Amino acid sequence: MIGTPYTEGARRAMLLGCGELGKEVAIELQRLGVEVIGVDRYANAPAMQVAHRSHVINMLDANALRAVIELEKPHLVIPEIEAIATQTLVDMEAEGVNIIPTARATKLTMDREGIRRLAAETLGLPTSPYFFCDTETEFNQAISEIGVPCVVKPVMSSSGKGQSVIRDIALSHKAWQYAQEGGRAGGGRVIVEGFIPFDYEITLLTISAVNGIHFCAPIGHRQEDGDYRESWQPQAMSDEVLAKSQAIASKVVEALGGYGLFGVELFVKGHEVYFSEVSPRPHDTGLVTLISQDLSEFALHVRAIQGLPIPNIHQHGPSASAVILAEGTSSNIRYQGIAAALEAVNTQLRLFAKPDIDGRRRLGVALARDIDIDSAVSKALDSASKVKVIF
């Protein structure tokens, strides 16, 4: 049963993290009559602008996190970012609070070590070779064993922060320092991974719902500086590779438990598929589903977490997204060229309405459909290029 917002019978959902992905989740929740409470570390975050009300707290402060959950008494607590006091969520789940998809899934996936050990050591899934390192001495030893090229990432980071590829061992110290600066909790543990010369990488959006496991068509994407720049759907792949990808994703999602949409990242090399990472929530590369599917990844997530069925997922055809990226410093961001960006048929824009910028920041995304993937990507890039960010 779903009541009406602001009434005694309302179903309340709390978003922990109010960025652009959380904003779309908030909109989908409201479409089903759910009262939405946004929580983040800064005011006027995108999802806060569409939530019924919001709170600003330090998300890593266990006491502050507990206090806001106890104050609002939400029926659903939906983590939308990794930088949260996850042990508090584990404790509160044991007290009866409904954490989406589960507190264990949130805690395991908040750092790369938990999910990599689950995938490789518990589930026996194929991954790149890896070492976890606490000191630069361990780091150098790991590089010597894995060899170059290799990939270095903080165990806790997002959007490519602190991530680099070492192609020359002489640059290892620089990579160590960069990883220490890029972690969400400051300096600390890193993962060194063998570099897989993959043919392509995909995100397989996998939904655990009341009526079973469902998959969206695979999403291909291009990364730059550890962050996505374009994504497209469907990614062309053989039936054999798709079946292997779905089998890996199913194992990971079932091991994590709970209902919801999971973004499973995979590398494909020839006929082999390697597990990379997973997010127990909508994925940034999945923004393409806002134009490519009848039910976006956000709509699917909101259905699943409320125990609602997913009878089918319709994919409209070759589609793409291209990021609108800006760099600068401002608290008065404006946009020009919107009309030009929307001139072509089957194009859409999402401007995230982020309140400020200090450095490089993703401020929106252009979406497009066309007769084939190359045309869709080209159209999305052209649309994105016409949006001018004014400071």
From Swiss-Prot:
Gene Ontology CC, one term: cytosol
Record EC number: 6.3.1.21
NCBIfam families: PRK09288.1 (NF006766), purT (TIGR01142)
Name listed for the protein in its UniProt record: Formate-dependent phosphoribosylglycinamide formyltransferase
Gene Ontology process terms (BP): 'de novo' IMP biosynthetic process
GO molecular function terms listed in the Swiss-Prot or TrEMBL record: ATP binding; magnesium ion binding; phosphoribosylglycinamide formyltransferase 2 activity; phosphoribosylglycinamide formyltransferase activity
Family the entry assigns: Belongs to the PurK/PurT family.
Domain ATP-grasp: 117-306
